[in-house]
Amino acid sequence: MENILDPSVVNSHILENGSRRSSINPILDSELRDKTFEKAHRRSLTLLSSFTSSMLELPNNGKEENHRRPSVARSSSDRSKASAKEDLFSEAFRMAEQPPAEALTISTPVDPINIDELDRAYAVSPSDTSNLLHPPTSSSSIPIPIKNAGHSNLDHPIRPSLQSSISSNRIIKSPGIKEDDYMHRGRSISSPMIDVEHINSTAVPSKTKNLPEKPKRSHKLRNSITFAKIEDHPERKSQLRRLSSSLKCFDPEYDYNDPSLSIRRDSSTYYFSNVNETYDEEDSDLDSETSTVNWVQSVLNLPSLLSDDLMANPKNKERFEWQYMLTSVLTGDIVRSEKLRLRKIASSREGRNSDYSDNLWMEIWCWLTHRSVDSYRENLKHLRTGMVDVLLAIMNFHWDESNELTPIVAVDNMLQKLDKYERLYPSRRSILQEHSLYASESFQHKLDVLTAYSNVTHALEIQVNIIRSWVGNEEMDITKNTTNSINNVSQISNGPFVERFYRETGLIRAFEQRIMTNMNSVLSKVCNTIVTYADDLKSYGLPLIADDYMRLLSFPFRLIKEFLNLRLSCAENITSISLFTIDSLLDDLRNTMKVAVHIIQQHTVLIKPFRDDSKFVDENQSLNNILVASLKFYFNLLHRKVRNGCALLHFKETEILEGEWDFLLAVCPHIEHGFQIMSKSLSSLVGEILTNINRYLKDQLQGPDTDDSALITSFYIKVLDCVRIRFRKLMSFTRILKAHLENSCEYVIKENSLSLLIQRLEESNHVLTYTASIEHEGAYVIVPGHLVDSPNILREVLSMTFNKGDNNFESVPPYAVVLAPDSSICWNGHVTDLDIPEVSISIAPNCVRLVTLATANQLSVIEDYFISIVGDTVSLVDSAKANSSKINKQMTKIKRNSLKLALSLLDVIQTIRTRYHGMNCQNLIHYSFSYAIEFAQRLMRLSILDASSIGLIRRKMIQLAISWVGFIYEDCSPTDRNTFRWTVTALEFAMIMTYGSNILMIDKKSFEELKEKVGKCVALLLLHFDVMGTKHAGRSMDQQAGDIPARLVRNNSDRSRLSDNELASFVKEEVMHRIIELESNRRDRLYKSQLIGRVLDDTTKENRLLKELASSKSNITIRWQQGGLIGSGSFGTVYRAVNLDTGDLMAVKEVALHKPRISRPMIKRIKGEMLVLELFDHPNVVSYYGIEVHREKVNIFMELCQGSSLFEFLRYGRIEDELVIQVYVLQLLEGLAYIHSCGVSHQDVKPENILFDHNGIMKFTDFGSAKMSGSASTKIFEQLTQQEEEEFEKDSEFLQHLDQNRGYSLTGTPTYMAPELILGNPSERVGAMDIWSLGCVIVEMATGSPPWPRLDNHFSLMYHIAAHNPPIIPADDQLSPLGQNFLKRCFVSDPNQRATAAELLMDPWVYPLRAGTEFDLMNSSVVESAPSTNGAPLEL
C-alpha cells in the first residue's frame, strides 16, 4: 500500500503518471519535458483554489451581483466539459479527506476560473485554509478544472524545463496597462462584500465562523485602493480633474466611490489582453512608445478622404481643438511618468512570485498529509538526500556485457529513480538551485540521450508486436502457412499471410494506414535518434537497436516482393487472356508498383544509419529485380491490349499510352534501367500502332460490295476520318516522346578537317576522357574542362536514355562530344579517366555526335554553341536523334512507318478515282483530295520526319496537285455548280505547290501536262464567270431556296464526327470506371474490421448457422483475387474476381453476415440460392462454381458476364431493329424453358437480372427469389450425400420453405410482377409468373420504357396490375403484328391459361429463328468472326 505521507507518492498522483516518453523525438524532447512539467506544476498550484472553493462559501442575499470580467467567465458548454476526467481532485480527495462539518456551507455553482487570473494581493494565504470561510473570488464556490497532462503509451514522465516556474498570479502584459488597471483586475474577480482587513483580524486557528456583510466598507476599500496613488499627489489629481473635465472623461459631480462606476470601468474602460506573455523587467517604455509612434505615424500617412473645404470650415475648429487637447494629455509628461512608475512596481512584484508558488506547493502537501509546514519541510530534506547519488549514477552510467540487466531495463531503472526524486521538488528551478550538477549541460545532454534511447526502444518493441500480431507468427514470416478449421470438417481460412493479404485487395489501404503512416513514423524518429546520438550511445555502451530496426525496415520490402512474385506467377498460369483480364492485371500491377516505389523512396532515407548492411542491400536489389520483371510484364500486357483490342479501342490507342505516361514517369526513375525499358517499349508500341493503322487502311480500301454511290461515299469518308483521327493523336504523342528520347545531334567531319577540329577542341579547354567501353567502338569522348570535376553529370550525359525535361540550365547545358575518326589522331590537351556503364552508341566513322542533357526542343542552343567552337570543320547530318542505338533504331522505325502511311494515304486518292470512275462519286473523290492535302500539311508541321522524307512527301503533293486539276477537267460536269468551287480550290493548291523552287522539281512531261490541264480548268472557269451580273439576277427565288438544302446536305456529308452510339459508349465507360473506383474504396473501408480464419464456436446460434454452410459440399477453397465492383443490392454485393490458379475471370457475390443479420431465414436464402444454382447447366444461365464461408461474410462464385446487363443496354433507348429483339427473346425463352424444366421458377425476371457475356449471349442471374417445385426437391435429394441427408432430416422445413413459403410471399419487382403474385393466388404451373415478366421485358425492349411508365409509385402500380390490366402493347411502328400476338399470349390474366416457355418457342414470331430461317444472321451476332475484308467498317 502506498504511503500517503510520502510526497513522492502523492505527487505521482498529482502528475497523473505523465510519461517521459510522450514524444520520442530527441530534438524536441527537452522542450516537451519543460512544457509538461510546467503544466503539472500549475495544476498543483490550482489545487488550493479547488479545495477552498469546495469548503468555503460567501453569503449573498441577492443584493449584489457577481461582477466578474467577461474574460474569466465560461459558458455552460465549457462547464459541461469539466468532466470527471478533468476534475482530478474534486471527488477523489473529497471522499478521502472530508473537511470539518462546520466549515461547509451551501454553495452554488458558478463559472470556474483559473487561479492564474487571481491577483496575489487578494489571494488568501494557503496556510490559513482551516481558518477561512469565504473564498476571495466570489460569493459562490468556484470549482477549478484541473486539466489533464495527458497519458502516453510509454512509461516515463517528461522531465521539467530548466526555466524557473512562473507564479500563479503572473501579470498579463497588455498595451497601455496602468497600476490601477492591475489592481482593478484583481477586484473584478473578487466580491465587493469581502472585508479583507476584517478577515485577517478575525481569523482564529482553532475554529471558523461566518463573516458579517460589510458592503459599504468593502466599496470604500475597493475605491481607496484604486485611487490611493492619486490621493498621495494632490497636484496631479487636480491636473487630471481639470483635463478630464475638458475631455468629458471625468465628471466632478460623479461619486467616484460608487461601486457601479468601477463596474462600468471594468467592463468598458479597461482592456484585458488574453495574450499569455509575461511581463519582463527588460521591457521598457521605449518599446511600447516606439510601437505606438510607428502605428500613429502609419495612420497619419493615410490619405484623407475629406475635401479641403471641409477641413478648413471654421465650424469644425472645435473638434480639432478637442483632439489636440486629447493628444497633449496622453503624450504629456504626467501620463508618461505614471506609466513608467507602474511598470517598475509590477516588475518588483515579479521577483516575489517564485517564492509564493513554492510556498503554495508546500502548503498543499501539508494540507493533504495533515502535517505542519515545519515537519513536512524536515521530511523533504531527509527524502532528498539520495538525489546526489542518483545524479552521480546517471553521470557515470555505462552499460557493458557483464551487466545482468538488459540495456533498456538498466536505462529504465535509472530514469525511474530520477523521476522519483524530481517529484520531491515544486519546480525544476528548485532542483537547479539545490543541485548544480543537475543544471550542468553535460548532465542534461546525457539525460536527453538516455530518455531518447528508452523512448525509441519501447516504440520499436510495440511496433514489432503489432506486426507480429498482424502477420500471425513470431518470426514475421509472411510465407508461413497457417490453417484454422471448424471441427476438422471444412476450412474457413487458410494459406500464408501474403495470400490472405492478396486475396482481400487491401494493399493500398494497408500500406497507407499500417505501414506508411504508423511504422514509418516510428522508424523515422528512431533514425533521427540514432543519427543524432550515435556517438553518445556508443560511449555509454548502449547498442544501436539494429535488430528490431532492420526487422521492421525490411518487412515492407519482403511483403511487396512476395506480393509481386505471387502476381507474376499467377499471371504466367493464365492460358486465355481477354481484354477485361488485361485491364484487371494492368490496374493491379500499377497499384502494386506505386506502393513498391513509395517503399523504396521512404526507406532510402531510413537506411542511412546502416547503409553498409549487406542484408538490406540484397533485399533492395531483389526487390528491384522483381520490379524490372513487373515492368516488362506490364508493357507486355499493353502490347497485347493494343494488338488484340476491339474496334472500340481504335480511337483510344493513343489515349491508353497517354494515360500511362504520368505513372511511368513516377515509377521508372526508381527502377534500375527503368527509363531504358520504358523508352524501348513505348517506341515499340507507337511503331506497332502505326503498323495497325496502315494495315487497317489497306484492308478497308477494298471497299464495300455495292454499287450505291451514297453508301460508297459514306464508307470511305468514315474510313479516312478514322485513319486521320488515330494518326493525328498518335503523332502528337510521338512528338512528346521524341522530345524526351532524342538528346543528341550528329555531324560529319569535312574532308581534311579532322586535325583542325582536334586543335579547336584543345584550344577551347576540352578534355579527352577514357571510358574503357566506348573506345571499343572506335570512338572517343571529349568533354568540356569545367565538367571534369563532375563525373556524375558526365555519366548521366553518356548513359541517359530518357530525358524527363526537369533540368533548368542557366547557361549552356552539359554536353559531351563523341568523336569517331576514320584515321589516327594526336591529342595534346588534358586527359582524364571516367568509369561509366557500358553504353551502345553505334556511331559511324568520320562522324561527330554531340550528346547533351537538353531535350530535343533545346538542342538548337547547344548546336549553336558547338558550331561557334568548331567552326566549319563539320556539317550537320541529323539534327535530332537518340544516343542509345536500340532506342534510335525504334525511333527510325517510327519515322519510316509514318512516312509509309503518309505515302499510302496520298496514293489512296488515285486508287479511289480509278476504281469508281463513272459511278457518280465525284464528291468522294474531291473529299479524298482535300483530305490528303490536309493530312500531308499536318504531318510536315509535326516535325516527326527528317528533311529527306519531307522532300519525298513534297514531290507526292506536286503530283497530287496535277492529278487534282485533271480530275476537275476530266471527271466533273461543266454545268455542275460544285465544279466551279472545286476548280478554284484545285488551281489554288497547284499554285501553292509550284511556288518558288518547287516548279523546278517537276519533270518536263509532268510540267507540260500541268500546263494543259490548268489551261482547260481556266477555260472552265470562264463558263461560270458572271461579269455583268445577268446570270445572278436571272435566278429565281425558288432556285435559291432549293439550293439551301443541297448546301446543308453537302456540308453535313463532309462533316467528320463520331456517331451517337460511340459517344454514348465513351461516356458510359468513363462513368462506370468512376463508379467502380468509388465502390472499390467503399469496399476497402468495409473490410477494415474483418476476422478471417478463426475457429467457430458451435455453441452459439450464429456459428451453428455458419457451420451449416461451411459443411456444404459446394464449399470450395480456391486462390483468387477480388477486383472491381460490378453491382450491389439488398441481398449482397457482386465483385469481379480472378482465379489465381487458372487465370479465369469470375464474379463473386458477397453476402455480408453481420450479427444482427445472421438468422435462419438468411442462411436458408443463401443455401436455397446455392442449391438452385447447382441444378443448372445451360448456356443461358450463369454458371455456379461454389461458395466460400467466412465468419462475417459468404462469397458465392459464379460466372462473370463481361458485357453488362440488358438494363444498361436499354438506358440508351429502345431497340429499333425487331430482328434483334427476336434474337434476344429466343435466348430468353431457351433459358426459361430449361429453368422451368428443372422445376424452378425464377420469380424476378427483369432487365437488371439479364446479363450479356463477352460473346453477346444472354444469361439469367440472381436466383435469390426463386421457387422450387416438388420435382426440383426430389432432384436435390438425389444429389445429396448421406451426411447432407441427415442434416436435411434435422431441418425438415427447409425444402418446405423453398417450395411453399416463397410461393406465397410477395417477391420480385412490382413493375414486372404477375397479377397472381400480387393477389396471393399463385398457379401450380411452374414459371407462369416468369412468362408475364418476360412480356414486360419485351415491351421495354420495343418501347424503351418499362410498362406503365405513367404510374409513379409501387402502390398504384400493384393496384393496376391486380385489376388484371395488361401492359400496353407496342404500336405497329415499334413491333410487328406477330410480335404483338406473342405479347398477348404472355399477358393472359389466368396463369393456368398462360402459355409456357416451351409453347412460346413454337410461336411464329420466334420459331423461324429457331428453325434456322434466320439462323445465319443470329449466329453472326453471337460468334466472333474474323474482320471482314469487304464489308463496311464497324460503326461505333
Curated annotation (Swiss-Prot):
GO terms for biological process: p38MAPK cascade; stress-activated MAPK cascade. Keywords: ATP-binding, Kinase, Nucleotide-binding, Phosphoprotein, Serine/threonine-protein kinase, Transferase. The active site is at residue 1244. The modification Phosphothreonine is found at residue 226. One of its GO terms (cellular component) is Mcs4 RR-MAPKKK complex. SUPFAM superfamilies: Protein kinase-like (PK-like). Residues 282-1123 are annotated as: Interaction with tea4. Its EC number is 2.7.11.25. The modification Phosphoserine is found at residue 224. ATP binds at residues 1126-1134, 1149. It is an enzyme of class 2 (transferase). It catalyses: L-seryl-[protein] + ATP = O-phospho-L-seryl-[protein] + ADP + H(+); L-threonyl-[protein] + ATP = O-phospho-L-threonyl-[protein] + ADP + H(+). The keyword Lyase does not apply. Residues 1120-1406 form the Protein kinase domain. Pfam families: Pkinase. Belongs to the protein kinase superfamily. STE Ser/Thr protein kinase family. MAP kinase kinase kinase subfamily. Interacts with tea4. Involved in a signal transduction pathway that is activated by changes in the osmolarity of the extracellular environment. Activates the wis1 MAP kinase kinase by phosphorylation. This is MAP kinase kinase kinase win1. The gene is win1.
